[in-house]
């Protein structure tokens, strides 16, 4: 019994001396972090606080409003300047043509001597479009005639074994430069002569571009009938174009304000019109003589 009791005591003491728990792998520092986090806001709260401050700042709001206003004003200025130099509605007017108008206008350019009324027609102080008024200038015929002239020049150069992209490009650019120079000269002449009329840059560009029709007929006749045919066609188309330019420009430039003007101003208008007409044969010859040999 004693042995058993001693053994029991010894066993109980052995159980009370159990091995201590193993130390943790990481120290528990949650308490320290909790105290530190209490002093700093969360990341999301920082961003929200900055946005709220920006939106609530009157200086920032004023700057944003001013920037928006400046951008809107700049956009309006750009649109205004574009419409000042190139008006889409005005440009559409010069392309408002139909087949009947094109046929009649081409006949008028080739034989204008029997035409009587050269005044442009108006409806409620608005000029009628070209398809309703034969005397109204258009840009469709000059544009198509210029393209046809370039193609015809390429064919003529090819027949003469002188075709190259550089030469064809030089022909096209030279034809455009001459027309623009003529328009600038007319604008300067109208300004110096103090002519008050409804002629715009598009009107002058249309009248100046009608010479391409005579250039096409001259080159085509020269290719078919040689140099003799070329000079006959050149003389005919130049005379017809001169008559057309004199009658058209004189009627368009002589508005109601200029009819009762002084005699020197009327003489300047007449000289300007005659000078523009007399210049047409020289340009036609300069742009076409090298295409016919």
UniProtKB/Swiss-Prot annotation:
Transferase: present as a keyword of the record?
no
**Subunit organization:** Interacts with YIPF5.
InterPro entries, alphabetized: Yif1_fam
- One term under GO cellular component: endoplasmic reticulum membrane
Q: What family does the entry list?
A: Belongs to the YIF1 family.
Put simply, this protein is called Protein YIF1A
Topology in the lipid bilayer: Multi-pass membrane protein
Subcellular location per UniProt equals: Endoplasmic reticulum membrane; Golgi apparatus membrane; Endoplasmic reticulum-Golgi intermediate compartment membrane
Q: Which GO terms describe its biological process?
A: endoplasmic reticulum to Golgi vesicle-mediated transport; protein transport
Pfam families assigned = YIF1
Question: PANTHER family annotated for this entry?
Answer: PROTEIN YIF1A (PTHR14083:SF2), YIP1 INTERACTING FACTOR HOMOLOG YIF1 PROTEIN (PTHR14083)
Q: List-wise, which residues carry Phosphoserine?
A: 12
In the UniProt record, what gene is named as encoding this protein? Answer: Yif1a
